[in-house]
Amino acid sequence: MFNQRHLSAAPNQDQLIWKILFDRQTALLHRRAAPAFSQGLARLGLRREFIPDIGELSATVREHTGWQLAPVGRPFEPAAFFALLAERKFPIVTRIRAMHSFDFSPEPDLFHDLFGHVPMLLDEGLTDFLHHLGQAYQTQPAGSVAREQLWALYFFTAEFGLVQHEGQPRLYGAGLLSSAGEIHHCVNEHTPRPAFDLATVLRTPVTGTRYQNQYFMLPAWEQLTDCVAELAGMLATA
């Protein structure tokens, strides 16, 4: 899908890091990734040989779900991040992680965003969910508990969520899809993977500096959309 001559601007070191990460993650995700991710990856036509052009990816995403990609130099604070979601835009960090951060990157980077998030942005169920989160965040006052809860909901779904598929846990959160270390930790038999419960998720503390203590698993992909109405009710009575 992508013309390589438009992608040569990335430094050789960045291209090498992309290639190594792409190979490792696609191998690890075999029969572990959610169908929505695998389908999105195939539709985008991402390749191991070179870093894709963000503008071309954005055009493909817009064609499928109406969303756009917004290149940024570094991760946003939650308020700016959710404001973009409310506009059906997703920020893409333009720097890629260093070699020493292969297994775990505490902050989003180019690989995390392009490989982990963008394939999922071709799924209308997820993009509708993200849009609702962005809109809901905008209605809550700065510094409110509700905003903290909305961040937790985003974190334990779009970043570290699991979904049950054919009786097995499948990964759909970008923090899992893009991190070998996080995958190994998640699939460890001693790591808790409780069923997704909105009230529990909203009050679970968020940490981005280490592997997660637990990963919430949707019993079905449709529950992600269904929880939007439940969330609206909770915020209205808060």
Where do the PLM segments sit?
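A contiguous, surface-oriented mixed alpha/beta subdomain in the mid-to-C-terminal portion of proteins
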Residues: A98-D226
